[in-house]
Amino acid sequence: MSGRRRAYPQPQYSAAAPSGISSPPVSQFQQQQQQPGQPGQPQAGFQGAYGAAAGVPAYGADQLLGQFQQMSVGNGAAVGTPQQQFQQPQYPQAQYQQTQQQQQQAPQVNPQLSYDPYQPQPQAGIYGQGMGGIPPAAGVGAGAQPVASYGAYGQASNLAGGVQLNALYTTDLSRDLPPPIAELSYQPPPITLADTATIIPGSKTANASSDYFRSTLNVVPNNSSLLKKSKLPLALVVKPYNALKIPDENVPVTCDTVISRCRRCRGYINPFITLAENGRRWRCNFCNLLNDIPSAFEYDEISGQVKNKFDRVELNHSVVEFIAPKEYMARAPQPIVYVFIIDVSVHAVSSGLTGTITRTILESLDRIPNENKTARVAFIGVDTNLHYFRFNEGLDGTEIMVVADIDEPFLPSPGGLLVNLDENREAIEKLLYDFPSFFESTANQGFALGPALKAGHKLISNVGGKLVCFAATLPNIGEGKLSVRDEASVAGKPKEAKALLTPADSFYKSFAVNCNSSQVTVDLFLTSAAYQDVATLANLPRFTAGQTHFYPAWTSNKYEDVAKLSKEVSDHLSQDIALEAVLRVRGSTGFRMSSFYGNFFNRSSDLCSFPTFPRDQSYLIEMSIEETINKPVVYFQAAVLHSTSFGERRIRVMNLALPTSSKLVDVYASADQLAITNYFTHKAIEKALSSSLPEAREYLISRVVDILNIYRKELVAGNVSGASPLQISTNLRMLPLLLFCLTKNLAFRSDRVPSDHRAAALNNLGSLPIPQLIKSIYPTVYSLHNMPDSCGLPGVKEESEEDGNDDNDEQGVEVDVVLPEPINDSKSSWENYGLYLIDNGSELFLWVSGNVVPGLIQDVFGTENLYEIPTGKTELPEYSIEESEFNYRVRQIIGKVREQPDSIIWKNLYVVVGASSNEPIEISQQRDLMALRMWASSCLVEDKTGSEPSYRDFLTSLKSKVSQ
């Protein structure tokens, strides 16, 4: 096997159709040369850059709530172009057995008109000067003179507090084909504030990063009528943590326990307050009340040194964390506690779940957060009985205690069941090592999950913690017993959702609410090829701030299954979770937090309770405008009061300031299409569970129609007769695509889907952070056979202007593996001899086209026979870079795509061989292969899939709906 780089046949370039090259499409806007005097619209926008111990009294969330309320926490453009043909040495054509194809030279493109959808064109912004023959939107106006520009986002159409807001640029969806998917990785429209809006003028860290805190609208309507008219939602997306481990975040912490809050609204001091009375007092930006500046801001009583209050991190940074004094503690911070509830029925033992889980826990003991050596653990095995394990002090072994009374489960011992991990390490290790042997000859088919949950809750209700459940069997005995539902009679019918996706037993929700009151979270890891009623069981994590992890048809006989489950469980246990947490979001006067979405429980109208706060989920808060807003800027603040796993009480505060406007044009010009997609996803889930799946799909499509209608009526200049009905602002042009693709997601699609799979998909969509959500809706596809030579190898960090003053000068230092530019989710972007990697957020598919050249599969798989490639769930053979550079690069890309610092998900790889004209009949008739091809192809969401139309057909249907 040669280690040299090969050059695989490149697709022909065609200006009329998409090619396999990872190049962005050129729309009619870019194809036409701008002519002075020609009616047109500038195409501009923002630049894409990512950039229970004995004697301890019970203390629950109700007491914590009372204490907390007393505190009143508040009211890309692709780098490739069509000219880029990667010049590499060519293999002899005979070796490839391919018909030689003549390469068509790419047409010359005016450099000024190269693909950059958010780069304003020279002279753009004046009616009659532009491209495409589409007049500017209202608010830009015929003959409007350019005033100024804000970065790359275009000209201002309005002033907010003396600051020019983002301009509106219109595009035609029917011309933006294929859709410019690079924009899915762009940052939201910039938030334009005056330098004087912050106490530190011009501060670049005063407003929260969209990774933590973002709004669906980056210009807020100043009254409810305008918001209703816009057909756009007003909501906040909150993700307080962006890494699984505390050291991986760069959030400043105030350590002096001095916390300054408004006396009236209880808002935290932040970068947007103003000073009064010679700096002795600060005016709250939420309620306008004057408050005293703490003396500790200017004088350190311990050291006797004078301090500069303007150096305080809470005045300089939008996201900060306070170490809280005792006044913020309802009780002393509790230790981190895990109760492992393990299925030991015959199904769990025979599938290997019991052995895999105990081995994984054993290997992960060092990863459990235990900095102060206070972590506690307990183990309960479950079949038709409850098997407790008592640790005897001073003894290496454990005693098994069996409780057969599952109707009234009790703790068989007053002590030794919940023990300190550090002090009992040897005994715990021995138990986990021996655990599978205790049940290896079982024939017990029962699984009393409900009684086990109640027993675990009783064990830790006075300290709180986590119940981590591993199940391979449907709960079939005791309280919470479930039965298999009749899917065949309702699948594909309007009543499917109510019959299959709503809870079958109220026990699980009521138990979850009780757990929340006791600061207990439930996490589920479900592994079975048979029905498990995910829709019912998912209530446990949903109301306790946990998560449901679903592994259909899992078996320990498959290495890849074991690897995925083990890695995800291990990463789950290693999270630096917060304990006994509450979240409250406040806004400026005139706003009300009306609805809350995510995995938690609302204990009051605006207080979200989290027994433990995970670091891999996000939350959405819908807002309503209660009165007219007369200020140019409004403010929002999210605060998470919590205890760390190492025993500190902390408050994480996030701040966001947004301009307001009375003009619809400004609202649309700064709308965040990804955050809006998140909002509509939550509403569609709500609609599906309360009504039906067809109504949820119709809800999504009708939202697109409403937005296009209002845009056409209000924002297309003069509502030009005969104008395309599919016009929308450039910053929202991915929204119709995303909502259309959401209807084809496993959670909502009209095709028949097993109810457990659909319920798991709905559950995941309701808690995913935005980047993972978008990938689940619109999978990322990479073309590997023609990727640039730099891809799959470490890149080099180049110093940018923003980095110029940084102390950390890493210019010329190797950094992360370079990935190819994504291509559109459509077979029209593929070649029949290509190699493609599909990432849908949960799995990876490596698609080997049926006419792939032998040299390519030799380099990747070590064989020239296409049908000798191992397909399905597998891993690639590992060759060194000297043995096969291409194999090495492909594996590096797969490894990079699997990296997710804020998620525990490990994506299995599925190898799929595409069909070809000379495919052997015995291959083409393999049911597993056909099913695998259909599964992978369903990720190509722009194409027609099953009974679902293509995106082009969807746009065609929209024209008639919008024109009506």
UniProtKB/Swiss-Prot annotation:
Ranges annotated as spanning the membrane: none
Compositionally biased intervals (Low complexity): 8-48, 81-108
Binding site for Zn(2+): 262, 265, 284, 287
Pfam families given in the database record: Gelsolin (PF00626), Sec23_BS (PF08033), Sec23_helical (PF04815), Sec23_trunk (PF04811), zf-Sec23_Sec24 (PF04810)
Stored InterPro entries: ADF-H/Gelsolin-like_dom_sf, Gelsolin-like_dom, Gelsolin-like_dom_sf, Sec23/24_helical_dom, Sec23/24_helical_dom_sf, Sec23/24_trunk_dom, Sec23_24_beta_S, SEC23_SEC24_subfamily
Subunit-level organization: The COPII coat is composed of at least 5 proteins: the SEC23/24 complex, the SEC13/31 complex, and the protein SAR1. Golgi apparatus membrane; Peripheral membrane protein; Cytoplasmic side.
Protein name, UniProt field: Protein transport protein SEC24
Annotated source species: Lodderomyces elongisporus (strain ATCC 11503 / CBS 2605 / JCM 1781 / NBRC 1676 / NRRL YB-4239) (Yeast)
